[in-house]
Amino acid sequence: NREDVYCEGIRQISKTDIEYAQKLGFVIKLLAIAEKIEGSSLSVRVHPTLVPSSHPLASVNGVNNAIFVEGEPLGQVMFFGPGAGAGATASAVSSDILNLVSQLISLPESNKQESKYKSKYTISCLDPLLASFHQENCQLAPREELVTRFYARFLTKDQPGVIGKLGTCFGECGVSLESVVQTGFQEKLAEIVVVTHDVTEGSFHKALDKIRNLEAIDSIPSLLRVL
């Protein structure tokens, strides 16, 4: 079901997060990700993501879109091109119309008449490269089982031991930290940015529940996943 696909927009992204991402060697991109995990489960999600500046997707800007594919034995391949704007949109629509027309022309005369009432005659003849078909349904994995890295920005009271308390909460939930950065203040509140190693989403949010109960924590204005 479409409702089972996790979707998150870019409204929470602030100038502060963009600046921290640059300092840490990342850019922020809105990605739609589908990946096979253990067994036959599929993880499908849409959300803003910190992408390493050296990654091919980091250089996709403006009206351009890209599809990045990784598999065996293919390795990594990226398809890149215009994905927005008048020209790109007109090209995509024209391609779909021409594909439909070409298939209607190639249908037997009897099927042409029936296709007016039964769209299956048209759909079954569509170019498989331009149509959307599947052989079997796939089980979507629960979001709690997703394994990824996380970026989190905390606003805390400026007092000793806050970073240590954060580390304790993360450690108790099995979350390993890759980096902890404290460089600025916002209205007398200290700003702490944390990037984790790979961790399940469930474990990460358990740690956040503990952290929210700390007296020194004012708020958690930003949470982002890291590619």
Map each language-model feature to its residues.
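Short, well-ordered beta-strand elements
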Residues: V77-P82, V193-V195
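An anion-binding loop in the catalytic cleft
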Residues: V69-F80, S94
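Substrate-binding/catalytic subdomain of NAD(P)-dependent oxidoreductase enzymes
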Residues: N1-S59, N64-A66, G85
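A generic structural motif
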Residues: I33-A34, E70-E72, L155
